[in-house]
Amino acid sequence: MKNIFKKDWIYLLLLVGLAILTFMQVANFRFGFFTAYDEAYFLLKLQEAYDMSCITGKSQWNLIAVHWFPYLDLTSKVNSYLASSILIWASILVVTITSCILFDKKRIIKYLALAWLFMFGLGGGLSYVPMQTAVLCWALCAFLLYHKSEIVWKKSLYAVLCGICLGFSLFVIIPAALVLLVCVAGLIVLSHWSDWRKMLLYIASGVVGVLLTCLYMHIIVCPLGDILEAMLFTATYIGKSGYKYDGVSFILQYGLFFRDCLFVILAFVGSYWLSKRVSIKWLGGIVYVVMILVYTHYQVKPLISPSMFMMSLPLIPFLFGKINNLKWNDLKKADTWFYIFIFAYPLLASFGTNTALSGRIHCFVVAWLFLWLEYEYKYPQENYRRVYIAVLILFAMPLLDIIKAFENRDDSYHFTRGNKHFAGIALTEKQVNYFNNVYNILEDYNYQPKQSAILTALYDYCCLYAFDAVNAANYHQVQNFHYFPKENMIAPDFIFLCKWDSIVMGQELKDMPWGWPDDFDRYYVGTPEPDNASWVNHADLETRHLYCRKSLKKLQ
């Protein structure tokens, strides 16, 4: 034991540092609220799951979440962040245990530190992102253990576990789960092509795992018929809108992604060629990093961030080693395709959402940790210190974000007139002034929490959450409004619209039997977002107006 601590002292220091930063991260949970985008939307989805008043969306992550965390009120931002962190911490433990089984049971400190490092900064509020990150991380670990094991019953057990995890993924993000199920089944077929009995046994084991998840969802969470109906309902109206969910958008996004990947390959080949012809072994890595930084600086809207480009740096020794030993016939072997699958896992797991690939891939790069450990395990004589430094540099951004957020905490401003959970969140002065101003207007029109209906789009879900309002329609994006079934909407007492919303939805709002805009008073309310916020379009949000039904106004 003494030798282990002596050997892994640097990882002990890393664990202490990560523990301190994680404590700071947890301490920041009740500070700040991103009012412009999805944070309030996800909290409202969790409230919807508790109410079970309606089941909407192609993803049922919210239904799963409230059953996985029965003792936490997930409509609280703090509890939502805590639940998300629990999923990530559980994934770190699963990766650590898997690494011990695959490589060296005595190096648990090392594997825990590296797993924590590779998943550091993930989490945030509970949504489909940390849910998908967790279940696909567990599925990856189960498949790695399946690949490693030689005992039939163990392989079958791991195949069942992999199927269970991918089954949950089917109810979170369907496309990614389907792609991974096909890849896993293909690798099983390729590995046992000569023994069809084992091939059928392992595929059947995976299918049993998926069916067990479906049984759990049907009995514990919600009847499958209701879930499928909700998925088809949402897929129909969102698919018709074509906003980032249509085939052309996916092809364009992945085409631009592979454009960037092509440059990565060229940079990698160039650095590999250079490293074979000079005596300074690390020169190729430096050239690679410089090329990536120059490319991302001058490229217009790169689909991969510089940090994601550089994330592949620790894999260079592994890939160099594989290329040196690779022969043409090796492409026929299942092991070769297994390593290709693990390398491509972050991309495959990111399939199926309209969010940027660079942000999604980062959630699954723990797959690359296993490639790195595999190479290190097979070639222990290599010097990895420079690679460790490179990995630490990659995680400087979340580290700096946590420290900056911790330093800038201000507990002076709270909005206490609406949702009790929102009252516990520390906001900026501008946000509190915004919510107080809007709430004053609402009160002039006899606003009643949990009774008055508000129609809004993505940018104003924060008001629905803060004011405890009834959501008039669950259409989410303004681009989806045209195809959203209007019979499912509640006649709103209040409407939030910015200029872009009015352009997209204006004519249809006039056609609705609500009397808009003639029967509504109009108030300019602006935006609660910071003036220097890079994540919002201020030219659009500064045009935000609140419409209040005239008949509800209090008599002066």
Predicted features and spans:
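Membrane-interface alpha helices of multi-pass inner-membrane proteins
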Residues: 120-121, 155-174, 180-185, 207-208, ...
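Loop-to-helix entry region of an early transmembrane alpha helix in multi-pass inner-membrane enzymes
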Residues: 59, 63, 72-93
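Perimembrane helix-loop-helix junctions
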Residues: 1-5, 148, 179-211, 215, ...
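Aromatic- and kink-enriched transmembrane "portal" helix at the membrane-lumen/periplasm boundary
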Residues: 76-81, 113-135, 171, 292-306
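Short periplasmic/luminal acceptor-recognition loop of GT-C membrane glycosyltransferases, typified by
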Residues: 400-483, 492-503, 538-539
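Short hydrophobic alpha-helices at membrane interfaces in multi-pass membrane enzymes
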Residues: 107, 142-168, 196-204, 280-287, ...
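Extracytoplasmic catalytic/substrate-binding loops of multi-pass membrane glycan-assembly enzymes
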Residues: 27-45, 53-68, 74-75, 224
